[in-house]
């Protein structure tokens, strides 16, 4: 196969390959960028593999960075964008099922490609667009099949995360996992527990945000791989619930975890926090999801949100909640929801026209819990449009609240 119309990303990187070839070495575009070009998908990274050893690559270019030189990877900066260029290599000794004990640089493209995970990722392409397919990846791609390169069990022992990558690709591409590859995942599923939670989480999120999530979830269930994911061992029913939803697509990591928390019935704040901490997500994501879940509960039970609920949820978490509510069948009109939020008198407590200093100055309170209570009452009154957000009006209101608390 020869690709005649190469995307601009390849055109920009061609001088790298041409420079390496002019010095007498081989160099190719490899992996996901070749796969995605053939499938007509947008490119993320352009990766180059070469027969030149790292020291030889560095001699050919003026600006390089050793991004992973022990594994043969050098970043070349000579042509604007940085391009990761990796020496052909073989790997051996995977005692931790994650990374090789030994990397050996070689001059053979075939030796390099045969250590890759799946046939559709074991493709190389020349600077002129000629695809080199040594493991029938093109035929598998045409048939929508995900097949391990060589012996599947060996590939999964080299890096157990490849099992998660298999179900993730099934979701993203809508491909079927080939039977021997699927059996090898089932036989070795327990190895996933040896993988860092953060690495598993990235694949899990990508699976759920794929265009064909049911294909990925089916793979998890068929192989029992889900049993070795954090907090998932007893979640078969939840996975089947997700699969039974009408066609759905999750647009963000935030909506992904909101849907998961909801479907796992983790709806109180402590349970949401515990789930997301188990998966080692950021505190920012935890705060977003807890706010979205509260809004989702209100949408489910009341069909709409009060001004106060809008205010405390915040616009981004509101959008997330409504995206998930739409998947679950009780979403609201998104534009209307955004408009309701926009019409709030204020959108942040710091916009309140008075603060503790103003209360002290007006001799309405002394420092202590009462000050916080009065400010909270003022905030609520402004959000509910009971009092305008003006200092004089709020001081009058604060005086009234203080009087009621003193009697």
UniProtKB/Swiss-Prot annotation:
RNA-binding listed as a keyword: yes
Entry annotated with the keyword Iron: no
Enzyme class (EC, first level): transferase
Residues bound to CTP: 32, 35, 116, 159, 162, 165, 168
E.C. number(s) listed in UniProt: 2.7.7.72
Any one biological process term the GO annotation gives: RNA repair
Signal peptide annotation: none
Protein residues bound to ATP: 32, 35, 116, 159, 162, 165, 168
Cofactor(s) the record lists: Mg(2+)
Molecular function as annotated in GO: ATP binding; CCA tRNA nucleotidyltransferase activity; magnesium ion binding; tRNA binding
Known catalytic reactions: a tRNA precursor + 2 CTP + ATP = a tRNA with a 3' CCA end + 3 diphosphate; a tRNA with a 3' CCA end + 2 CTP + ATP = a tRNA with a 3' CCACCA end + 3 diphosphate
Record-listed Mg(2+) binding positions: 45, 47
Keywords, sorted A to Z: ATP-binding, Magnesium, Metal-binding, Nucleotide-binding, Nucleotidyltransferase, RNA repair, RNA-binding, Transferase, tRNA processing
Oligomeric and partner information: Homodimer.
UniProt family annotation: Belongs to the tRNA nucleotidyltransferase/poly(A) polymerase family. Bacterial CCA-adding enzyme type 3 subfamily.
Further details from the record: A single active site specifically recognizes both ATP and CTP and is responsible for their addition.
Function: Catalyzes the addition and repair of the essential 3'-terminal CCA sequence in tRNAs without using a nucleic acid template. Adds these three nucleotides in the order of C, C, and A to the tRNA nucleotide-73, using CTP and ATP as substrates and producing inorganic pyrophosphate. tRNA 3'-terminal CCA addition is required both for tRNA processing and repair. Also involved in tRNA surveillance by mediating tandem CCA addition to generate a CCACCA at the 3' terminus of unstable tRNAs. While stable tRNAs receive only 3'-terminal CCA, unstable tRNAs are marked with CCACCA and rapidly degraded.
Record-given protein name: CCA-adding enzyme
Species of provenance: Lactiplantibacillus plantarum (strain ATCC BAA-793 / NCIMB 8826 / WCFS1) (Lactobacillus plantarum)
Gene that specifies this protein: cca
């Amino acid at each position: 196969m020869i690709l005649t119309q190469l995307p601009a990303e390849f055109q920009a990187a061609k001088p790298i390959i041409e420079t390496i070839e002019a010095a007498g070495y081989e160099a190719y575009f490899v992996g996901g960028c070749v796969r995605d070009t053939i499938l007509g998908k947008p490119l993320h990274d352009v990766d180059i593999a070469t027969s030149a050893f790292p020291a030889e690559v560095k001699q050919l270019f003026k600006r390089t960075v050793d991004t992973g030189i022990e594994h043969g990877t050098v970043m070349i900066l000579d042509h604007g964008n940085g391009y990761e260029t990796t020496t052909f290599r073989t790997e051996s000794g995977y005692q931790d099922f994650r990374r090789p004990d030994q990397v050996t640089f070689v001059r053979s493209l075939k030796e390099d490609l045969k250590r890759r995970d799946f046939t559709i990722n074991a493709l190389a392409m020349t600077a002129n667009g000629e695809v080199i397919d040594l493991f029938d990846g093109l035929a598998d791609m045409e048939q929508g099949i995900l097949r391990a390169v060589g012996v599947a069990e060996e590939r999964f022992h080299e890096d157990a995360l490849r099992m998660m990558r298999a179900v993730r690709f099934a979701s993203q591409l809508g491909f079927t996992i080939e039977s021997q590859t699927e059996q090898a995942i089932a036989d070795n599923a327990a190895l996933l527990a040896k993988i860092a939670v953060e690495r598993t989480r990235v694949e899990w999120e990508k699976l759920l945000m794929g265009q064909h999530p049911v294909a990925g979830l089916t793979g998890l269930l068929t192989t029992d791989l889900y049993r070795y994911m954090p907090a998932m061992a007893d979640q078969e029913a939840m996975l089947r619930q997700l699969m039974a939803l009408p066609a759905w697509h999750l647009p963000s990591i935030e909506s992904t975890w909101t849907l998961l928390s909801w479907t796992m019935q983790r709806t109180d704040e402590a349970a949401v926090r515990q789930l997301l901490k188990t998966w080692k997500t950021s505190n920012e994501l935890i705060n977003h999801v807890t706010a979205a879940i509260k809004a989702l509960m209100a949408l489910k039970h009341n069909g709409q949100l009060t001004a106060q609920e809008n205010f405390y949820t915040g616009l981004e978490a509101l959008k997330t909640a409504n995206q998930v509510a739409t998947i679950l069948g009780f979403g609201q009109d998104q534009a209307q929801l955004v408009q309701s939020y926009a019409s709030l008198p204020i959108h942040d407590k710091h916009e309140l026209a008075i603060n503790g200093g103003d209360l002290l100055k007006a001799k309405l309170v002394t420092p202590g819990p009462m000050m916080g209570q009065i400010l909270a009452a003022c905030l609520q009154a402004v959000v509910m449009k009971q009092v305008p957000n003006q200092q004089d009006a709020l001081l009058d209101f604060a005086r009234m609240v203080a009087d009621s608390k003193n009697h």
